């Protein structure tokens, strides 16, 4: 919702009746309106259905089957509003053996294979906070799908369901690595590839004051500038792309 609201959409959050409003403290709630509804009551269900009748889209994040049991599933709401784009966000997808399982970002990026690529050589994988599953593979993928669905509905008059699973999104985020592996340009070991800290010109280094600096000098002109500024005059640094020399450099 934050991404859509930030780009000008009118976003209304349907909150549980009596719940605390975190909009003033939660950055993810910015630019969103808020209403309360008791989804266990006929009145609450009717209120949501009425709201959806004039909406471009709706987003829900319950476990699979919950919205259907509430009487707010896609068949019902698209019956009320055929142009509605119905967004669904789950960890594992609507179907399959894990669809009803609980999970967090770390679980989704593990199953997708994404987590395998993060970390130093000969060490365990290091989760990159919850940026990959929850936000990149989840929220951003769904917001893109919602925009695409709404644009399609405006030209065709037909709504649709956007089924977004964080596991699927996390796998897509790593598409470049999967492609490189298929081409033989990426090794299936952490910390031995150019973009995962193996290369001396693409890594982080501790400074004298205890802070850290990131270096990303892939292109020849930037690598030459790095050598000039860092005083790397040893001829050994000439062979920038010689992977066999990276560990010693």
Q: What feature does the model see in each segment?
A:
Residues 12-14, 183-190:
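Short Pro/Gly-enriched beta-strand edge/turn motifs at strand-loop
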Residues 196, 200-249:
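Aromatic-enriched alpha-helical interface/lid elements that frame and gate functional surfaces
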